[in-house]
Amino acid sequence: MKTRLLSFLLLFLLVCSAQSQTYQPTEENLKSRQEFRDNRFGIFLHWGIYSMLATGEWTMTNKNLNYKEYAKLAGGFYPAKFDAARWVSAIKASGAKYICFTSRHHDGFSMFHTRFSDYNIVDATPFKRDILKELADECHKQGIRLHLYYSHIDWYREDAPWGRTGRGTGRPNPKGDWNSYYKFMNNQLTELLTNYGKIGAIWFDGWWDQDQNPDFDWQLPGQYAMIHRLQPACLVGNNHHQAPFAGEDIQIFERDLPGENRAGLSGQDISALPLETCETMNGMWGYKITDQDYKSTKTLIHYLVKAAGKDANLLMNIGPQPDGELPAVALERLAEVGEWMKVYGETIYGTRGGCIAPHPWGVTTQSCLLYTSPSPRDCS
């Protein structure tokens, strides 16, 4: 009886110990968080074979395109004008300190060379070049940090469980094979964190696809732990529209500044983690030929300033063209924002949100600066 009681107590203590364990970021990770906050400005790049259709990155599900037919787009994807050096140079000139690139979006096409699926930029297209490798090499060369977007959704793979999107793409098994799919994702993440040098962050998206299935378990703790094991300094963020989960290093807000919820996607509480808001330069994330509603340079600068005033980074999105070039208007905006940043960038970089709440006339930061329209002035 005593032996059984002792065994029970030991088991109870082990369970309690396991439950009490929480994510403890390493010193390298904490340093990366501060550097992330100091950088304040990044550029998001949504690019994939969906750019060929020129109707945005969600066309596959919005138009219920059959997954096998959609995959044929890869056979014609040849972005002959892609030049990683030109991309990175233009982005660096804007004052942005990092790039977040869509390594794999919801359509399941990998924009890097992976051993775990033939459905990728090298094996499935006539282009035959690892775009991510070229971009990563150029980022490291020019001193721009590289973050990688990675979708938890896949409208192409048959082992990916169905969520509330991608239900009309013709995949045969709604339940999929979670163990197979989870292993596939972790294998790809291992490649991304092994073959492309230092990665500043993994930017997840798609958790919300299972929000109508509360019992679904994405098994995020194991995935996050793997990332931190492979690159301890790599930050983990998840665009799940919730308060941060254990193991995450940054908090993401989509199309809204922290504390605002005008788009209906960012009503979550604000945490003590570094903050980032992502917004489009025009209307769409991926390239859409009819979307010429680009925000003015003044509007983009004001958004950057407001984000800094709310202690958040701005991740501003561009959808590259199918030929591999950045749209001309986007290049103009980058150059114009860059001119402003040359003069006032020191009032953005390294700042923290001010003690006075943002107002229509401007915002404050802990660098003791008052930002007013159209330019900041010293308030010391």
What residues fall within each predicted segment?
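Bacterial N-terminal signal peptides that target proteins for export
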Residues: 1-6
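Bacterial N-terminal signal peptides
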Residues: 7-15
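Ordered hydrophobic segments in well-structured contexts
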Residues: 13, 370-371
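Mature catalytic domains of secreted/periplasmic carbohydrate-active enzymes
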Residues: 21-370
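Single conserved hydrophobic/aromatic residue that forms the stacking wall/gate
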Residues: 371-380
